[in-house]
Amino acid sequence: MNLLGFLAVVALSTASVQAGTIDHNQVVPFAQPEATTISQKAAIKFKPQIHITNGCHPYPAVNEAGETSGGLKTSGAPSSSCKGSGWGSQVYGRSTWYNGKWAIMYSWYFPKDSPSTGLGHRHDWEHVVVWIDNPDVANPTILAASPSAHSGYSFYAPPSSDSVGGTSVKVNYESNWPINHALDMTSKSGETQDLIMWDQLTDEARAGLNSADFGDTFAPFTDDNFKTALGKAWPF
């Protein structure tokens, strides 16, 4: 092996070590950047609220170095060790045109999905797709919302007025024992998190999410999953 080949192997080995998993409460989120593009401005404008009825609160899933959360075992109460990160939380966004509608996917990560001790699984990803007419008009209109639920979706086209606060749809995260957690629309106000769009993540963070193994769940906005998820979330 020549010197350049050896150095390449060392670099790849170092990167793989650096971009491993770390404790769920040690993942530092991205600060919400200033929006500079039409799509980024629309994503902030329509950023949703999430109300937590039971279970974990959202946590960041990846840091700027590409290290991803190791999650939590399903021991203890549904919200045990996951009532919120001291570093702050995160909502992940990705958007595109799909069948003539503008789709904005907002995704949250939870360290575990456990209705009660021993039930459920490590890691949970839930998301809502907000469908609007056009991000590049003065007053875009919400046409529909598709919250994720147990590998499928609920469809609201359009969502009811009491489940939208201004331009922010309101979703609820809840488990109806013994079934795992899911999202649905709600009239209850919730919390918001710093938004980071897919194109605003570092290269390392995108690579970390693309290659991460989240067990029984997956990040719906990664390169392998995004378009397929939009097809399943299509509400029209």
UniProtKB/Swiss-Prot annotation:
- Predominantly, its location class is secreted
Sequence motif: Hepta-peptide GHRHDWE motif II, positions = 120-126
Keywords, ordered alphabetically: Secreted, Signal, Virulence
According to the UniProt record, one GO cellular component term is: extracellular region
Range of residues in the leader sequence? 1-19
Outline the inducing conditions.
Expression gradually increases to a maximum at 7 days after inoculation of pepper leaves.
Q: Where is this motif: Conserved undecapeptide motif I?
A: 103-113
Give compartment(s): Secreted
InterPro entries on file = NPP1
Disulfide bridges in this chain: none
User: What family is it from?
Assistant: Belongs to the Necrosis inducing protein (NPP1) family.
Q: What is known of its domains?
A: Key residues/motif important for the effector activities are degenerated in most NLPs, including the nlp24 peptide consisting of the conserved region I (11-aa immunogenic part) and conserved region II (the heptapeptide GHRHDWE motif) that is important for phytotoxic activity.
Provide the function of this protein. Secreted effector that contributes to virulence during infection by P.capsici. Induces distinct chlorosis at 3 days after inoculation of host C.annuum leaves, and all the chlorotic areas gradually turn brown and become moderately necrotic at 7 days after inoculation. Leads only to chlorotic areas, without necrosis at 7 days after non-host N.benthamiana leaves infection. Induces cell death in hot pepper.
Report the protein name in the record.
Answer: NLP effector protein 3
Task: Please tell me the species this chain comes from.
Answer: Phytophthora capsici
Taxonomic lineage per UniProt? Eukaryota, Sar, Stramenopiles, Oomycota, Peronosporales
